Amino acid sequence: MHVQTKSKKKHLLPLALIIAMAAVMAGLCVVSWSERGRLQNELEVQQQLNVAQRRVQQAEQELSDLQEEYDKLLKKQDSSKPNGEIAYQTLYPELMLDPLTGYTQEQKVYLTFDDGPSERTIEILDVLKQRDIKATFFVVGSNLNSEQGQEILRRMADEGHTIGIHTDSHQYRSIYTSVEDYLNDFKKVYDKVYEITGVKPEIFRFPGGSVNGYNGDIYQELIAEMMRRGFSYYDWNVSSADATGSISADTITKNCLSGIHAYRRSIVLMHDSAAKKTTAQALPGLLDTLIAEGYEFAPLTRETLPVTFAYPD
């Protein structure tokens, strides 16, 4: 009986060793998977940091490029002064803002509307109010002569939207004849906005964009002068293409979504003149889609880093 017990023990020893080794291996696997998870988390965090750093570097480079271009234009402008000052620089001293200390670059969608106000603007304001979204309206001075236009402008200001200058006349051939002619037009609509709302506009959009088929002889000088005065101007990187004539609401929506999906920071060009019925019709569905996709919206301010067109070679 004693011999049989010893025999059983001998058989049990290898089994115990196998079980012990299996337990050790299982522990090592647990540690290994835990370590792998920790390393994976660290890698993901580092990748996110790298992406954020690249974005910061890109923003800094864009700001540096803008400042460099501005300095070049100022230098060119200064070299042409016969007595240290060009005549148009003495015009409208009230059109001077305090120096800008820097730009912000938020990853948001900036909705902008040109050529209003009109009855379309009322529809657009209603849609924006229902969704608590603020936008930017670059207004035309000739639309502010009516009581309706003035009421709409006051509503823009009261509801927290940004009011920017577009033009008084929207006559490209006349406003782009010279820097002085542009300033004369700018001053007219600036005064109207201030008188109606008490708001002094700080941003603007050149009719046709900063570089267009009408201002080729003066655009560098004109941009330098407006920047010298402290105003920020904005082109766009997403277009609804609603300025091209008759275009459906579905096409406007597709154009906007395609552009917005391509950029982390979008300045969207749309129009709110009376003829742009499909723009107002497209807006609710467009906004609801973007909201569902997690996009955030903001109005432009003078401190928003501009999107601007490149100068032609």
Residue ranges and their predicted role:
Residues H2-K6, L17-I18, G27-L111, P117-Q130, ...:
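N-terminal pre-catalytic segment of deacetylase/amide-hydrolase enzymes
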Residues L13-A22:
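Sec-dependent N-terminal signal peptides
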Residues K108-Y110, K134-T136, G160-G164, P201-I203, ...:
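Structural preference for beta-strand elements that scaffold enzyme active sites
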Residues F113-G116, S142-N143, T167:
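Active-site metal-binding loops of divalent metal-dependent hydrolases
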Residues L125-D132, E147-H166, E195, I223-G230, ...:
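Acidic (Asp/Glu)-rich catalytic clusters
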Residues A135-N143:
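A short beta-strand-loop structural module common to alpha/beta enzyme folds
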Residues V140, E147, L153-R155, E159-T162, ...:
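Glycine- and small hydrophobic-enriched segments that form the cores of compact globular domains
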Residues H170-L269, S273-I291, Y295-E296, R302-D313:
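Catalytic domains of cell-wall/extracellular-matrix polysaccharide-remodeling enzymes
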